[in-house]
């Protein structure tokens, strides 16, 4: 086997591989000899089929296998000896298309090599960790929100009209073209006005009603309504108002705390403080992570594989286009050309991605099975009732596993950077932290 370099420009590599016909022939014969004892053929005892007959029967198929194995072996040997790591799957093609048995096999292989990543010393990197304490006002606001979510309704004074946010208890019968329809009637139904739980326009017409009132509510079902026989049609709901109730927030006391699993109000306040500070810490981490990535980007410079940058730029352009055009699904749209800004961002992402991967590999960073399981279960919660199917899908899909593994790996490498860098704490207000987070989104 002969391997000749044909291209070596920057990260681009090209090689001509020649596999001698004699080598292929030897490997085919070896495979036939290995299989011969187990082969049965009409007119011959098991293991006694002559080699020429075996070659005629199976030679062509085995030659295809041998050629593929030889090319794969040549590639693997080349990468082991050269130390090159291809950025993407190498492009391999056979150049003698008129090949026939007895000819050498000529193959061209081209690829872009991953660059050598320089050592990075982050001990001199200065990072600022924003710290926000849970203030009493924030805890009180959270308590008020909990009390509001635990609200109850109590009857308004006799003759009082309903207001937006009130609950009305109604009997109703819905009709289309004068005929009642399935699912269009109920008794003693508690409807919160302003909840938008009914057909658009329904709840607004019940604002101002009183207990004992009878009112016809006329609405039009949306064109995209689930029941096709009702979609786009006008309906009249004859409603009888039985009660009008005003919302009453739960009192902030030990009883409220018990509703949310705490022993008393003090424990609930403590839990809220911990949750708030955990949220603040998560946001502060994102701010410090961006600062760390900015610092790393300034510390290193190396050539990037054009194919990786191009693929990343296209992905960025495609994602941003869909964010601006949320109504368009899939790829049914004109081709999206990346801009200079997309290319610049792609270069940063590829450079940092390669750097973090190298740092993690040298530090022997690993994503544990437990961490992967937690990540999968977190994603599975988005598909209630189908968690098991989602879990099985991930187990059988290596690409999806990598998509879940990558951010975990990256965060563990970032933790290494935090440990080695000079980190100082700065106590700030919740508002200042929010501004810092918003600044990340604007970049």
From Swiss-Prot:
Domain annotation PPIase FKBP-type: ranges: 165-250
Domain of life: Bacteria
Enzyme class: isomerase
Domain notes: Consists of 3 domains; the N-terminus binds the ribosome, the middle domain has PPIase activity, while the C-terminus has intrinsic chaperone activity on its own.
One GO MF term: peptidyl-prolyl cis-trans isomerase activity
Family: Belongs to the FKBP-type PPIase family. Tig subfamily.
Pfam family, any one: Trigger_C
Keyword tRNA-binding carried by entry: no
Described purpose of this protein according to its UniProt entry: Involved in protein export. Acts as a chaperone by maintaining the newly synthesized protein in an open conformation. Functions as a peptidyl-prolyl cis-trans isomerase.
Catalytic activity: [protein]-peptidylproline (omega=180) = [protein]-peptidylproline (omega=0)
Record's protein name: Trigger factor
SUPFAM superfamilies, per the entry: FKBP-like, Triger factor/SurA peptide-binding domain-like, Trigger factor ribosome-binding domain
The keyword Isomerase is annotated on this UniProt entry: yes
Organism: Ruegeria sp. (strain TM1040)
UniProt xrefs under InterPro entries: PPIase_dom_sf (IPR046357), PPIase_FKBP_dom (IPR001179), Trig_fac (IPR005215), Trigger_fac_C (IPR008880), Trigger_fac_C_sf (IPR037041), Trigger_fac_ribosome-bd_bac (IPR008881), Trigger_fac_ribosome-bd_sf (IPR036611), Trigger_fact/SurA_dom_sf (IPR027304)
Cysteine disulfide links: none
């Amino acid at each position: 086997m002969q391997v000749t370099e044909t291209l070596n420009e920057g990260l681009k590599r090209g090689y001509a591989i020649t596999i001698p016909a004699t080598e292929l022939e030897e490997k085919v014969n070896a495979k036939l000899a290995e299989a011969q004892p187990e082969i049965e053929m009409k007119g011959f005892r098991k293991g006694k089929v002559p080699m020429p007959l075996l070659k005629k029967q199976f030679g062509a198929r085995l030659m295809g296998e041998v050629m593929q194995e030889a090319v794969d072996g040549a590639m693997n040997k080349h990468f082991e000896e050269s130390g090159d790591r291809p950025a993407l799957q190498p492009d391999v093609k056979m150049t003698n298309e008129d090949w026939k048995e007895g000819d050498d096999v000529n193959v061209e292989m081209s690829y872009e090599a991953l660059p050598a990543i320089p050592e990075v010393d982050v001990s001199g990197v200065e990072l600022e960790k924003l710290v926000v304490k849970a203030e009493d006002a924030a805890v009180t606001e959270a308590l008020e929100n909990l009390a509001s979510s635990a609200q109850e309704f109590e009857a308004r004074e006799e003759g009082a009209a309903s207001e937006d946010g009130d609950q009305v208890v109604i009997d109703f019968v819905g009709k289309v073209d004068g005929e009642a329809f399935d699912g269009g009637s109920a008794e003693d139904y508690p409807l919160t006005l302003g909840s938008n739980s009914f057909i658009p326009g329904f709840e607004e017409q019940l604002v101002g009603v009183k207990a004992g009132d009878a009112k016809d509510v006329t609405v039009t079902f949306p064109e995209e309504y689930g029941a096709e026989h009702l979609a786009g049609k006008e309906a009249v709901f004859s409603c009888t108002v039985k009660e009008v109730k005003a919302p009453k927030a739960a009192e902030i006391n030990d009883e409220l705390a018990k509703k949310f699993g705490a022993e008393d109000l003090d424990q609930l306040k403590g839990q809220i403080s911990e949750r708030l500070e955990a949220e603040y810490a998560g946001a502060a981490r994102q701010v410090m992570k961006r600062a760390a990535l900015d610092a790393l980007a300034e510390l290193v410079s190396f050539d990037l594989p054009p194919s990786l940058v191009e693929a990343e730029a296209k992905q960025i352009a495609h994602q941003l286009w869909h964010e601006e055009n949320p109504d368009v699904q899939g790829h049914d749209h004109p081709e999206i050309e990346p801009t200079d800004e997309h290319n610049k961002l792609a270069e940063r992402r590829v450079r940092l991605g390669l750097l973090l991967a190298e740092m993690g590999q040298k530090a022997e960073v690993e994503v544990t099975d437990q961490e992967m399981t937690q990540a999968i279960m977190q994603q599975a919660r988005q598909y209630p009732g189908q968690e098991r199917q989602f879990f099985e899908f991930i187990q059988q899909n290596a690409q999806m596993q990598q998509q879940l593994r990558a951010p975990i790996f990256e965060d563990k490498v970032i933790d290494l950077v935090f440990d080695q860098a000079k980190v100082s704490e700065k106590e700030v207000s919740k508002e200042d932290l929010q501004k810092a987070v918003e600044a990340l989104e604007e970049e």
